[in-house]
Amino acid sequence: MWLYLVALVGLWTLLRFFRERQVVSHLQDKYVFITGCDSGFGNLLARQLDRRGMRVLAACLTEKGAEQLRNKTSDRLETVILDVTKTESIVAATQWVKERVGNRGLWGLVNNAGICVFAINEWLKKEDFANILDVNLLGMIEVTLSMLPLVRKARGRVVNISSSMGRVSLCGGGYCISKYGVEAFSDSLRREISYFGVKVAIIEPGGFRTNVSNYERLSHSIEKLWDQTSSEVKEVYDKNFLDSYIKAIQSLTDTCSDDLSVVTDCMEHALTACHPRTRYSAGWDAKLFYLPLSYMPTFLVDAMLYWSSVKPAQAL
């Protein structure tokens, strides 16, 4: 019995291995639009796909970021300025893409732009949550809906960058909320547009060293949020908690990997494979920590986080 089971698992693994290595033909004729290309995953993916001969349309937030990217790539790659929080910017970028892809349509849309704030929910105001959701979720949704007719024409791919924290909410501050939203939107979109031959993939990176996970920026944002809280909240948590919380964030960022290609290789596979995965867990922590944690009973996860987390001054 066990021998048959092992044989079946081995056969399934072998079939999956060969199936996932089938590559889409004529990649050099296919256009891919990527948001958030100033730095990090988007920047590396743009250069990676350009080296592969694909037609990369890279959206950057700043002209400086766009210029630096163009200097590192071939003449095939084109850039456009895009602020995903502004409708007029999205409309202009969509028209720009439409003029370039023509009747071929857009093969790949990669929603990569994002920001991050880790903090206690009680320290935030409504607008603090809104700022994160505008970029990470609502901006992504608006870009997708705007570009979708072009992707449908090419029977292409939508690749949305979520996070391992879109599976397990380890902290407050709006980031996890936005990534849970990315997961839900991507799942519903995948089912809706599968009828048109369009595939949707979700990338769930673990900890990687990018501008989003920069310790100095994160600690500064935490201190800024602490300063705006009421005296009552500060008394409940106290300054020692703040210091310990920031140290915990530093410990988390110190474990981040420098090898961004682990993530961009997943993104590239989602765009170029004949049979892309629905979800990609990128990184050892994503596979060995966050993914198993997401399947554990809630009470067990809560207990683990309770005993391992920093405690407020007035904790019971």
UniProtKB/Swiss-Prot annotation:
<keyword id="KW-0560">Oxidoreductase</keyword>
<keyword id="KW-0492">Microsome</keyword>
<dbReference type="InterPro" id="IPR002347">
    <property type="entry name" value="SDR_fam"/>
</dbReference>
<feature type="binding site">
    <location>
        <begin position="33"/>
        <end position="57"/>
    </location>
    <ligand>
        <name>NADP(+)</name>
    </ligand>
</feature>
<dbReference type="GO" id="GO:0005783">
    <property type="term" value="C:endoplasmic reticulum"/>
</dbReference>
<dbReference type="GO" id="GO:0003824">
    <property type="term" value="F:catalytic activity"/>
</dbReference>
<protein>
    <recommendedName>
        <fullName>Retinol dehydrogenase 7</fullName>
        <ecNumber>1.1.1.105</ecNumber>
    </recommendedName>
</protein>
<dbReference type="InterPro" id="IPR036291">
    <property type="entry name" value="NAD(P)-bd_dom_sf"/>
</dbReference>
<dbReference type="Pfam" id="PF00106">
    <property type="entry name" value="adh_short"/>
</dbReference>
<keyword id="KW-0256">Endoplasmic reticulum</keyword>
<feature type="binding site">
    <location>
        <position position="163"/>
    </location>
    <ligand>
        <name>substrate</name>
    </ligand>
</feature>
<comment type="function">
    <text>Acts on androgens and retinols, i.e. has steroid 3-alpha- and 17-beta-dehydrogenase and cis/trans-retinol catalytic activities.</text>
</comment>
<keyword id="KW-0521">NADP</keyword>
<keyword id="KW-0520">NAD</keyword>
<dbReference type="GO" id="GO:0004745">
    <property type="term" value="F:all-trans-retinol dehydrogenase (NAD+) activity"/>
</dbReference>
<dbReference type="GO" id="GO:0042572">
    <property type="term" value="P:retinol metabolic process"/>
</dbReference>
<feature type="active site" description="Proton acceptor">
    <location>
        <position position="175"/>
    </location>
</feature>
<comment type="pathway">
    <text>Cofactor metabolism; retinol metabolism.</text>
</comment>
<comment type="similarity">
    <text>Belongs to the short-chain dehydrogenases/reductases (SDR) family.</text>
</comment>
<dbReference type="InterPro" id="IPR020904">
    <property type="entry name" value="Sc_DH/Rdtase_CS"/>
</dbReference>
